A protein has these predicted regions:
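ATP-binding/phosphotransfer module of carbohydrate and carboxylate kinases, centering on a glycine-rich
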Residues: 2-87, 132-139, 181-330
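Generic enzyme active-site microenvironment
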Residues: 40, 122, 142
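Short beta-strand-loop/turn "lid" adjacent to the catalytic site in phosphate-handling enzymes
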Residues: 63-68, 83-121, 132-133, 219
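Glycine-rich beta-strand-to-loop/alpha-helix junction loops that act as flexible
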Residues: 92-99, 143-146, 267-278
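Acidic-glycine-rich active-site phosphate/pyrophosphate-binding loop
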Residues: 105, 145-159, 230, 279-289
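Glycine/charged-rich beta-loop-alpha catalytic/anionic-binding loops adjacent to active sites
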Residues: 111-118, 157-164, 286-291
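Short loop/edge segments at beta-strand edges and connector loops
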Residues: 122-123, 297
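Glycine-rich phosphate-binding loop of actin/hexokinase-like ATP-binding domains
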Residues: 136-187
Length: 330
């Protein structure tokens, strides 16, 4: 599968984001100033992050509403608006929920035609991996609103998880928030949980449990109703046994994603990214289980790398990324 052969990570400095419109240098993951202005779009269940890269710097960034190919109406129109709204010569997009290589190719062709510039589309796992490792083999475990893992050993791709909130997303913010509400309900029913966790859930949700349950059932696809409660667990884990247990289980689930990909590809290095893994209580346990490191650059930078590499490929772009495997997580 073609990966940018000339990208090299010269050091281990983390990617810094000093401000929305303040230029910031990239980590040493690009081969000097690149031609053109490259747009990177990382869509996700919590937000869509966009960067414009020119001359080895991020010259502009934006946070847009969440986007998922399975859950978002008019996703092609929304992406077209982002692509045409920026002064970019090429764009790369990591989009969750785009199930088939053929669907990715169709969307890329449509956006390329309508935006009148090259647009390359892949899953969000692949752009996460590009940002985390560049040209190097590795495994990226992502845990935001959803969860999943993508790996590349230099020849083969593998993935685990990413099946969406109805059938998977273990260890994600949605999974943690659902576990928090479940524990609060169990306490009210006299079946476990804790009063401290129940009180924290009620305070964070801004309503009593009955109203929260009714809202979740009325709007089951609104994943933020539960995923926004994940900090209840990470904040309480140091003092509350139930919260600590949920955080531990989340870390174990995320580590299992990495181990599943390692079982297929071998003992590759692991990077962890996403808001859930930013919580120290989960990150520390996850690293104990996997030896993971932080990524050198975020997924939106990986999407910009996709835009660059796609422009260097003959006859149709970065096919190794645009047609690798099915994707369903974010």
């Amino acid at each position: 599968m073609p990966i940018p052969a000339k990208i090299s990570f010269m050091n281990n400095e983390p990617f810094a984001s000093p401000g929305r419109d303040r230029p910031s240098p990239l980590p040493s993951c690009l081969p000097g100033p690149l031609p053109g202005r490259l747009l990177g779009i990382d869509a996700g269940g919590g937000a869509t992050r966009v960067v414009l890269v020119a001359g080895g710097e991020v010259v502009r960034r934006q946070v847009a509403p969440p986007m998922n190919a399975l859950l978002t109406e008019d996703v092609s129109e929304r992406l077209l608006g982002l692509v045409t709204g920026w002064d970019a010569t090429a764009a790369g997009i990591g989009l969750p929920g785009l199930r088939s290589p053929a669907a990715r190719a169709r969307l890329a062709a449509e956006l390329t035609r309508r935006a009148d510039r090259p647009v390359h589309v892949t899953g969000d796992g692949e752009t996460a991996l590009l940002g985390a490792f560049g040209a190097r083999p590795g495994i990226a475990v992502f845990a935001g609103t959803g969860s999943g893992a993508t790996g590349w050993d230099g020849r083969r791709w593998a993935r685990a998880g990413g099946h969406g909130f109805l059938l998977g997303d273990e260890g994600s913010a949605y999974w943690i928030g659902r576990a928090a509400v479940n524990a609060a309900l169990r306490w009210e029913d006299g079946m476990g949980g804790s009063a401290a966790l129940r009180d924290a859930v009620v305070q964070a949700s801004g309503s009593d449990l009955a109203a929260l349950v009714a809202e979740v059932h009325a709007h089951p696809a609104e994943r933020q109703l539960l995923s926004r409660l994940a900090p209840v667990i990470t904040d309480l884990a140091g003092q509350d046994e139930t919260a600590r247990y949920i955080a531990e289980r989340a870390a174990v689930h995320l580590a299992a994603l990495a181990q599943a990909v390692r079982a297929e590809l071998g003992p590759l290095p692991v990077c962890g990214l996403g808001g859930v893994l930013a919580a120290p209580v989960i990150w520390h346990r996850f690293t104990e289980l996997t030896g993971a490191a932080r990524p050198l650059a975020p997924p939106e930078i990986g999407a910009a790398l996709l835009a660059w590499r796609g422009g260097r490929e003959e006859a149709g772009g970065c096919r190794g990324l645009e047609a690798t495997h099915e994707d369903g997580g974010d």
